[in-house]
Regions:
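Bacterial N-terminal signal peptides that target proteins for export
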Residues: 1-11
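Bacterial N-terminal signal peptides
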Residues: 9-20
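Signal peptide processing junction and immediate N-terminal pro/mature segment
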Residues: 22-24
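A short beta-strand-turn-helix
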Residues: 26-43, 71
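Structural alpha/beta surface segment adjacent to cysteine/selenocysteine redox centers
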Residues: 41, 49-132, 137, 207
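Soluble periplasmic/extracytoplasmic beta-strand elements of cell-envelope proteins
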Residues: 44-47, 78-81, 171-173, 189
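Acidic/histidine-rich, surface-exposed loop or edge segments in extracytoplasmic proteins
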Residues: 46-51, 184
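C-terminal cap of thioredoxin/glutaredoxin-like
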Residues: 62, 129-208
């Protein structure tokens, strides 16, 4: 792990503009349906990701279930998903919109699971079928999806990821929930789909 003031990184990757982001409130968590875990969990884990990203899918299949059971469902970590579309248009953007539209009906995580379970083989023509399968109001979902609601918010997520210094997906930030990163308690960047053990090591250190 490498320390850079208010920020630490693992895997030897240096990230920039971190103190400025913390001072500007970057990484602030809002209750928009993309949060798993207790609001008062001591640690917050942010993921910046794309539903079409192969390494993001690897995290979903191999690491996410273990983090969910050991840390999130036990109240130790609050998990927040952020969109980081790899292009300005196309299936990645459409998948992010579909998930947000599901979230508007309180069903973000079932759509998240469905999209990542497709292992990158996504087709926007199937999204309305996914909406039906997870019990959404189909007309409301179709209107939201067809009007491309949430695009501005999706791109804001990507801008936030860039300010943390990420240039690819997935990227993760670990920080204390109360107070955010400080010089004494810096945030931790975990770039890429690193093994579960890397997450566990950093989380356990912060919880100690």
């Amino acid at each position: 792990m490498m320390s850079t003031g208010w920020f630490c990184t693992v895997a030897g990757v240096s990230l920039l503009a971190l103190v400025q982001l913390a001072e500007a409130g970057g990484g602030a968590v809002t209750d928009d349906g993309r949060i798993r875990g207790r609001a008062d969990a001591p640690i917050t884990l942010l993921e910046y990701s794309d539903f079409t990203c192969g390494y993001c899918g690897k995290f979903f299949r191999e690491t996410w279930p273990r983090l969910l059971s050991k840390y999130i469902e036990t109240g130790k970590v609050r998990f927040v998903y952020r969109d980081y579309p790899r292009s300005d248009q196309g299936i990645g953007i459409e998948a992010a919109v579909a998930a947000r539209c599901a979230g508007a009906q309180g069903r973000y995580w079932p759509m998240y699971d469905r999209l990542f379970s497709e292992r990158g083989r996504l087709d926007s023509g199937l999204f309305k079928g996914y909406a039906k399968a997870i019990g959404l109001d189909e007309a409301a979902f179709a209107k939201c999806f067809d009007e491309r609601e949430y695009l501005e918010s999706i791109f804001r997520d990507r801008q936030e990821a860039n300010r943390w210094g990420f240039r690819g997906t997935p990227g993760f930030i670990l920080m204390r929930t109360a107070g955010g990163p400080t010089e004494k308690e810096p945030a931790i960047a975990i770039p890429g789909a690193v093994p579960y053990e890397d997450f566990a090591e950093e989380i356990d250190r912060m919880l100690a």
